[in-house]
Design a protein with these regions (language model features):
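N-terminal membrane-targeting hydrophobic helices
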Residues: 1-149
């Protein structure tokens, strides 16, 4: 059997890699109202509108909790080690987007991450086409759930 520490680290690394690979697939992103210059990769940042920021953070929180709930419902960890692996996968899978959010505070040390994120992220934006983008993402989610099971 694999060393549990190594397995946890591998789970975390695979989750990060799967996030970047998934970003390469054209997908729908819900619009964030609190971002200034959303189409300009170099100059986009969080805006100063407090109510828009609260709304966006609320949307992201619901999105995150829903995703975690679905993962827990499918994987159903029982042992402590299973819980650790699932948490490592969740944190690793969410980390790239979290770091992108921090980057929009103009944190220069995150430039290498943003560069990597931009390389992997598809340039095909399905934001204006939710009737295509959302079903496409649902198909990808079903395939991912099938693999998990």
């Amino acid at each position: 059997p694999m060393n549990p520490y190594l397995a946890t680290l591998l789970t975390f690394a695979i989750a990060i890699a799967s996030h970047y690979l998934s970003d390469a697939i054209p997908h729908w992103d819900y619009p964030l109202q609190s971002i200034e210059n959303p189409e300009d990769k170099e100059n986009r940042k969080w805006g100063s509108g407090r109510s828009a920021l609260i709304k966006d953070i609320s949307s992201m929180a619901v999105d995150g909790f829903l995703g975690v709930g679905i993962v827990l419902a499918v994987v159903r960890p029982v042992t402590a080690q299973e819980w650790i692996w699932v948490i490592a996968a969740i944190v690793g899978g969410c980390l790239p987007d979290f770091l992108q959010g921090l980057y929009m505070f103009r944190l220069k040390f995150l430039r290498p991450h943003q560069w990597l994120h931009d390389i992997f992220h598809s340039n095909i934006r399905l934001g204006p086409y939710p009737l295509f983008g959302i079903p496409f993402q649902l198909i990808i989610a079903v395939i991912a759930l099938y693999i998990l099971m």
